[in-house]
Amino acid sequence: MTEYITVGAEDRVEARSNTIKLHGPDGFEGMRRAGRLAAEILDALVPHVVPGVTTQEIDDIVYRMTLDGGGVPATLGYRGYTKSCCTSINHVVCHGIPSDKALKDGDIVNIDVTPILDGWHGDTSRMFLVGDVALKARKLVDVTYECLMLGLAQAKPGNRLGDISHAIQSHAEKHRNGVVRDFCGHGLGRLFHDSPEVVHAGRPGTGPELKPGMFFTVEPMINIGRPDCKMLDDGWTAVTRDRSLSAQFEHSIGITETGHEVFTKSAKGLDKPPY
């Protein structure tokens, strides 16, 4: 097993503000670099997410790639979390902890990474299909990715956060899926979690107005069944209460003068992730 180093405690103090920060060109450049590293890590995982591989082995790869890229994993040591990524399998909604559990044929798994590079956080997650996956699971993954992209289409100056939320909720519920309310997107940049909170269900025309320089994540969690979640005893892992399948995609973005920039988009120019 990899011998991990962690970010010092002085880097773990987060003074989240109720004020939404507006960033300039230096912030955009910092987020581009951090986001590029995050996307490269997920791209590199594709051939490794196969039956028989353990989520701990995946975590080891994420750790090594983050350090090799000049960064450190934001999650490692964060509020006592001991891993470099989150691996959420099947009915796990988010924050699944890597372990010696091996992936099985037919699993769907979300891998969530956040490298810190030069003080900036690149937060992103993607679904991976393991072997031969059932049609209903593939459909859930497709719908969840569509929810993310429809939400991002509303990310432009003059719109409001509720426009993003409504686009996601409308598409998910059109397909009779549940939108998780217990977790949300968040502002980020120099901090891992900052204002605003970005919920994934809501009414159009509500919430803070989007302005150039705002940085935040959009990360819908969509369930085949009901949206309700429960926490496991480890204090991190959230699962669907009805044990239905759950999927999630996440991008970090910045609002520009004319729309938005996706910091964590793959450089491979894919229309959708290679799942």
Question: Would you name each region that the model predicts?
Answer:
Residues 1-275:
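Active-site neighborhoods and metal-handling regions in enzymes and metal-associated proteins
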